[in-house]
Every structure is written in C-alpha cells, then in structure tokens.
A protein has these predicted regions:
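Conserved motor-coupling elements within RecA-like helicase/translocase cores
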Residues: 220-237, 253-254
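Conserved helicase motor
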Residues: 193, 215-226, 241-246
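ATP-dependent helicase/translocase motor core
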Residues: 1-185, 194, 198-210, 233, ...
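Short loop/turn elements that form and flank the Walker-type P-loop nucleotide-binding site
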Residues: 150, 182-183, 231-234, 256-258, ...
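Hydrophobic alpha-helical scaffolding
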Residues: 98, 124-128, 162, 189, ...
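Signature of the SF2 helicase/ATPase Hel1-core->accessory helical subdomain module
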Residues: 2-3, 32-33, 40-43, 245-251, ...
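A short beta-strand-to-loop transition that corresponds to the Sensor-1 phosphate-sensing loop
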Residues: 24-26, 192, 239-243, 266, ...
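Hydrophobic positions in the central parallel beta-sheet of the AAA+
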Residues: 188, 237-239, 262
Length: 296
C-alpha cells in the first residue's frame, strides 16, 4: 500500500480511495492515502458483538454466491474453502473484525462522509475508532433534551497529542451533514489567542468552514461576540472565553435557542467561576461539550 502510493509507482490508483486496509489473514490495520506506516491503526468495534462476527464468518454461502466468488479461480481454491467450512466453527480473527466493521455499506459511507478530512499540513486523515465512537456518543447526547428544553452536553477526554482538534472538526462536520442537527450553530470557545487561531486554521483546513467563513467566524471583540450570538447567522463562531464578560453586558448578547452547540477547548481550566456563568447566561439552552487533555 505505502510503496505503491509513491510518485514513481502508481499514485493515481489511490486518487479515489477513501479507506485503505492492510491484512494478512489474521491481523488488519486501516488508514487512508498518504498515511505514514506508524499511523496505521487497529480498529476496536463498540457496536458489533463478538457473536455477530462468529455468525457471519460461519454462515454458509448459497451456490450462486459461491459461483461468483470461485468460478474464475482454480477449483482447488473452492475446495479448500468448502473444506474449511466443513471442518467446524471458524475462529474470528482481527482481520475479520476489521473487514466486517469498516466495509459494511453503512459504515463505509459514514467513514467517508463524516470521518475523513483533508488537512493542509497533515494531508488526508481518517478518524480513529475512539474518535468515531466518541462523536457518535456525543451526537446521541446532543439530540436529547433536559426538562428545561436545553440540549444535553458532555465531556471528551483526549490524551495529549491524540487528535483533539480533529475530533472537534469531525464533530462540526457531523453537525453540518446530519439532517437532525443541520440547523445547529457551533460556538468554539478557547482560553488563549494562539489556541483560537490554531483551531480556526484546523477547521478551515479540514473543510468545516471556508476562508471567508473563517474571517466572519472570529469574535474579535466582546461587542462582536454579542452581535454574533444575538443577531448573527454564522454557522461557526470562535471566541476567547473572557470576551463573554464584556458581551454579556450588552442587551443583544442572548440567544435561548437549543440549536447551539458550544465546544469548550481545555475545559478543565477555563470553566470555573464567572466564565461558565457568563456563557450560561448568554446561551441558556445550548449544549455544552468540554474537551480536555487532563485526566478527569
């Protein structure tokens, strides 16, 4: 896979490839085009049971399916397969788990649509299983409401350097593409200017917003943030946490829509005292999702 993608090999063969799998009969890894060997990853499934894998591997195929698989191959290949099936229950391998998990029609389309992005620096990126199932859990949370009509939120804990910013981009893409959340706006809150700039660049590079949208998304002052919250229609807003202190003093800084998702970066260190209170006052029914690299 990696060798054939090189410039002097057959890189054009991979131009339309979304997921790449490397298997050897027992094990399997996945990645996408241009992924360095050290970043090829194992997949750990959370929605398919081991019993399902076993049933699928040991289900006998009807004759028409066997013909499609083996008629163009030497007869001994078909005989070997039939001998394996007749020999008793086959043991499920990591290769089996990878193939069933990622190449189901619904999962493959989901991975392509929601969990693949292009980054100007890192290239094409496909989500790790932790990101996929973490985002799925978040989506389940934010599509539910509490007794006051506010969306439920949650916390995502990432180890340092494991792709927290990309998880935020994947989540934002899901909010854009999923019909049930298509009306939602996203407010990205950080506590440092350099983090705000970094996240804005990552969102733009990852396709969650255009360069023009990036400029409009920045809450450059507390007054600008108040206008964006109360009167704006930007799909994504970026703000430093302390701008809420100024914004909340302005009458337009209020929006009680439940269709606002607040993503708080470094949530472990910025949500004490008045910081969180000001956000809750401005956006009382929003879903609040904290991201942190600090163990909880």
């Amino acid at each position: 896979n990696i060798r054939n993608q090189k410039v002097d090999e057959i890189p054009h063969l991979f131009a339309y490839s979304q997921l790449l799998l490397s298997v050897n009969g027992n094990e399997g890894l996945y990645a996408t085009c241009g992924t360095d060997s050290k970043f090829w990853a194992k997949w750990k499934e959370e929605q398919i049971t081991e019993a399902t894998y076993t049933r699928l591997k040991n289900t006998s195929l009807p004759k028409d399916k066997l013909d499609l698989l083996f008629n163009h191959r030497p007869a001994k290949v078909r005989d070997e397969y039939l001998s394996l099936i007749a020999g008793g229950e086959l043991v499920v391998t990591d290769q089996d788990r990878l193939l069933v998990s990622l190449l189901r029609h619904d999962r493959l389309l989901e991975m392509t649509r929601l969990f693949t992005l292009f980054d100007k620096k890192a290239g094409k990126i496909v989500a790790r299983y932790q990101q996929v199932f973490g985002i799925k859990a978040l989506i389940e949370r934010i599509t539910s409401f509490d007794e006051h009509g506010a969306r439920n939120g949650g916390v995502i804990w990432h180890t340092t350097g494991s792709g927290k910013s990309f998880t935020m981009v994947f989540l934002s893409k899901a909010l854009i593409w999923l019909k049930v959340l298509a009306q939602c706006r996203v407010v990205v809150v950080t506590d440092r200017v350099d983090l705000e700039d970094q996240l804005a660049r990552t969102f733009a590079s990852g396709g969650a917003l255009s360069d023009k949208d990036k400029k409009d998304a920045m809450a450059t002052t507390g007054k600008r943030l108040a206008e964006q919250i109360g009167k704006g229609n930007e799909r994504i807003i970026f703000s430093i946490i302390n701008k809420f202190g100024t914004a909340i003093t302005l009458p337009e800084c209020y929006n009680d829509s439940p269709d606002i998702i607040v993503l708080v970066d470094e949530g472990h260190r910025s949500q004490n005292g008045s910081n969180n209170i000001f956000m809750q006052q401005a956006l009382p029914k929003a879903a609040y999702i904290g991201f942190t690299g600090t163990p909880l």
